A protein has these predicted regions:
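ATP/NTP phosphate-donor binding region
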Residues: 1-74
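Active-site histidine-anchored catalytic micro-motif
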Residues: 55-144
Length: 144
């Protein structure tokens, strides 16, 4: 099992929308980004994150955006913006060779479970079944 280096203050988290975008709740999502920034992380969002559409973009676009975060050596961790119902559609567009050669933590819960299953069981990369990026909108953060 590959355990990527855990992100630390000053690292960059890439956020993608493999299912739903967050356009319907931008105020809350902006608060979540602010919380992550306040915790010391830089944030990079893919183009579809702030879309209102369900899904956030066609499956091939969502897959390409996911791949771009793993290809970027400046990104230390990848998180799903939110849950939804459409992650399974983008699985065929995940470049497994690319992801395996650039292992990073991927975090999300609910619909992102399908991505975590692929990364953990097929690519042998540990993942985090935990909050999506949009879940950091609590002030103060809940103690887990």
């Amino acid at each position: 099992m590959i355990y990527p280096e855990f992100p630390k203050k000053g690292d960059t988290i890439g956020i993608c929308a493999p299912s739903f975008g967050v356009g319907h709740k931008l105020e809350w999502f902006d608060l979540a980004i602010e919380t992550l920034n306040d915790a010391g992380f830089d944030i990079v969002e893919t183009e579809s994150v702030r879309n209102e559409a369900f899904p956030s973009a066609p499956a091939d676009i969502r897959g390409a955006e996911f791949n771009s975060l793993f290809a970027d050596n400046n990104i230390n961790m990848v998180m799903s913006a939110s849950g939804g119902d459409y992650n399974i559609e983008m699985i065929p567009f995940i470049d497994q060779k690319l992801v395996k050669s650039h292992p990073k933590w991927f975090a999300g819960y609910s619909d992102p479970t399908s991505i975590e299953m692929l990364l953990t069981t097929v690519l042998d990369i540990a993942t985090i079944y935990g909050v999506n990026a949009g879940s950091f909108d609590w002030r103060p953060l809940h103690k887990f």
